[in-house]
Design a protein with these regions (language model features):
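Short, flexible helix-loop junctions that flank or precede catalytic/ligand sites
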Residues: 1-365
Length: 365
């Protein structure tokens, strides 16, 4: 039942439905039509959790838990088990068996500059399933090949397994190796890493220690579940009380190096999905906007629009290029755009493949 292919991103086990897989963003049958019962999903959950007492306790007390699962000789999975209507439901994210190659992911050339950074914070953001972990793994792998550093990762759970190459790479997993991101990150400052990957900046304490690490000469890589660069800054600032936000903005402006946001969009030819990427880079202009806050005519999006020569790009510009190159169709591209009405105007010279949608205008307001 756990056989996978390169096109499958997730597996779903839910009472009342046959097993399902997600292929290129859409659910499809997993090869059997037998409907799962509550007892079926309970047994599957029990097998996946095994003797992980922390996961067992979380499922009982909090109604959900996260575990990693390895299928011998095949794939690894990041598993979330949760209660719904009194029964277990399971989502298994497929983790490829090999670390993704930077060039194979077709990441923007600008992101190669991260490999040479000596300090600061790099954030990769996007919704669940947008490829954040793959991008970070590819960056870590390139650092592992080209630098001679101590690299430390703190993950929940560990996804891609890195072997020592030119670097020494230590990977710590939440709950089995450390009780929290914040404690592991604090300990990391005494473990002499040059590069620290924090799986997610979930809380105020983790953000504060990440900033401290960046300010004391470490390169910190992490993720946030935000949709673009502007929302990322506001999310971080919003974690802190008003009395601390001015100081926080100042520290963040000085520490951030890149904010990379991703969306995976179905390709026009049906051959999977393509990563649409937004890049906000630390420049004099963007540091000012982060520190002082965005105002009319002085937004991070404005900075990205005029910052192409500095290596920046914004979602809608990236989507426009893919539409013009025939990688995306117009309807799909507009559905994933930040400002679909504006993008539709930019594409007005192309043959109309979709009718103008009045909802595109209202979605921007």
């Amino acid at each position: 039942m756990l056989k996978t292919s390169s096109k499958i991103s997730d597996l779903f086990f839910s009472p009342g439905k046959p097993p399902l897989v997600e292929v290129s963003g859409k659910l499809a049958p997993a090869g059997t039509t037998r409907v799962l019962s509550s007892e079926d999903t309970r047994r599957i959950a029990t097998d996946l959790v095994g003797q992980n007492q922390h996961a067992i306790d979380n499922l009982k007390q909090l109604g959900s838990c996260d575990v990693s699962y390895c299928l011998p000789g095949a794939h690894r999975f990041r598993v979330n088990i949760f209660m719904q209507r009194g029964s277990c439901a399971i989502v298994m994210r497929v983790i490829p068996g090999t670390v993704p190659d930077f060039d194979a992911l077709n990441l923007p050339v600008e992101l190669k500059k991260i490999i040479g950074l000596r300090n600061g914070i790099v954030l990769v953001t996007g919704p669940t399933g947008s490829g954040k972990s793959s991008t970070l793994a590819a960056i870590i792998d390139r650092i592992n090949k080209e630098q001679s550093y101590h690299v430390l990762t703190i993950e929940d759970p560990i996804e891609f397994l890195h072997v020592h190459k030119n670097c020494v790479v230590h990977q710590r997993e939440l709950h089995s190796d450390t009780p929290s991101f914040a404690l592991a990150l604090r300990a990391a400052l005494r473990q002499a890493p040059k590069v620290i990957l924090v799986g997610e900046m979930r809380d105020k304490e983790t953000i504060e220690i990440a900033l401290e690490a960046a300010e004391t000469g470490h390169l910190v890589l992490s993720t946030l579940h935000t949709i673009d660069a502007s929302k990322t800054v506001e999310r971080i600032v919003g974690v802190f009380p008003m009395s601390e936000q001015h100081t926080l903005r100042n520290r963040l402006a000085k520490s951030f190096r890149y904010i990379i946001s991703q969306r995976l969009v179905p390709r026009k030819d049906g051959a999977g999905r393509v990563a649409v990427i937004e890049i906000l880079k630390s420049t004099l202009r963007t540091r000012e906007y982060v520190e002082k806050g965005e105002t009319d005519g002085k937004t991070l999006l404005d900075a990205m629009r005029v910052g192409e020569q500095e290596g920046m790009q914004h979602f809608d510009g990236n989507i426009e290029r893919f539409i013009r190159e025939g990688v995306l169709d117009m309807e799909t591209g507009l559905a994933y755009a930040t400002n679909p009405g504006n993008l539709q105007l930019e594409l007005s010279d192309l043959p109309k493949s979709v009718e103008p949608d009045p909802l595109l205008e209202t979605s921007e307001k």
